[in-house]
């Protein structure tokens, strides 16, 4: 469930951009595909829904023995929900990361080469989940 039950009788055009995005994701789940190709599935969603949507996607992949190839521009989402990250630039492939098994000290140099000086740290949520947080260090402060 993507949380749109109360809008089930509404026309697609009546939904907000975020609700449309969730509706399209739900349609993808119903098709039970084993390979999902998703271009920024969280793009029209607010902060909370971005994380919930990526959690739904990760659960779908696990329960359906599926794989998802997802483009994301938010490194925090990628670091917390993707098993493998291919870090790209206009010049091509910069590197590959495995956030759940690679030590933070090995990920920071590659991410710093893209975003400038950053540091990674872990945070525990109220639900006891671990989150990897990327902090951009401002050289002007």
Where would I find each of the regions flagged by the language model?
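Conserved ABC ATPase "signature" region
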Residues: 1-7
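Catalytic Walker B motif of ABC-type/P-loop ATPase nucleotide-binding domains
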Residues: 36-40
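Helix N-cap at the start of a conserved alpha-helix in ABC-type nucleotide-binding domains
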Residues: 47-49
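Helical segment within the ABC ATPase nucleotide-binding domain
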Residues: 51-63
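Conserved beta-strand-loop-alpha-helix hinge in the C-terminal portion
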Residues: 88-117
